[in-house]
From Swiss-Prot:
One of its GO terms (cellular component) is plasma membrane. Disulfide bonds: none annotated. Its main location: membrane. HAMAP family: NDH1_NuoA. This is NADH-quinone oxidoreductase subunit A. It comes from the Bacteria. The keyword Iron does not apply. NDH-1 is composed of 13 different subunits. Subunits NuoA, H, J, K, L, M, N constitute the membrane sector of the complex. Belongs to the complex I subunit 3 family. The gene is nuoA. GO terms for molecular function: NADH dehydrogenase (ubiquinone) activity; NADH:ubiquinone reductase (non-electrogenic) activity; quinone binding.
Length: 146
């Protein structure tokens, strides 16, 4: 059934699970937990905060950070390929070419759907004036109401 080489992997997984359960249970039993009104107030560097400390950020910041991480990790793969370019030959070159092509297609797709535009879709088209529209006063009245 189990080869002798698999016992090391099984012991490693069991050891990691035991260590995780042990650390979580130690934190639960040894750590004190008390709630009061003053513990729910944000506090930094000995200075009481003025106003609300919970600032809402736009989702765009999160998306840009995720895109950066994704493209940065893929840059590591390209760097690893660049180090071993002589060893992998033309097969490695074609694989990295396909990989970079997929990256560029995904980047173009993200640009086309407007993921890098900081202006919202509804407000982006309000300021565009159609040059073929004869009655622009009607357009200006509508845009001033918003």
């Amino acid at each position: 059934m189990c080869d002798i080489y698999h016992w090391g992997l099984i012991a490693f997984i069991v050891g990691i699970l035991f260590l995780c359960v042990f650390m979580l249970s130690c934190g639960y039993f040894l750590g004190g937990c008390s709630s009061s009104r003053s513990k729910n107030v944000p506090f930094e560097s000995g200075i009481k905060s003025i106003g609300n400390a919970r600032i809402q950020f736009s989702v765009k910041f999160y998306l840009i950070a995720m895109f950066f991480v994704i493209f940065d990790v893929e840059g590591i793969y390209v760097y690893a390929w660049a180090i071993s370019v002589r060893d992998v030959g033309w097969i490695g070159f074609s694989e990295i070419f396909i990989f970079i092509f997929i990256l560029l297609v995904s980047l173009i797709y993200l640009i086309r759907i407007g993921m890098f535009d900081w202006i919202e879709q509804s407000s982006r088209h309000v300021h565009c004036v159609d040059f073929f529209d004869i009655d622009t006063s009607r357009y200006l009245k509508k845009s001033n109401k918003r």
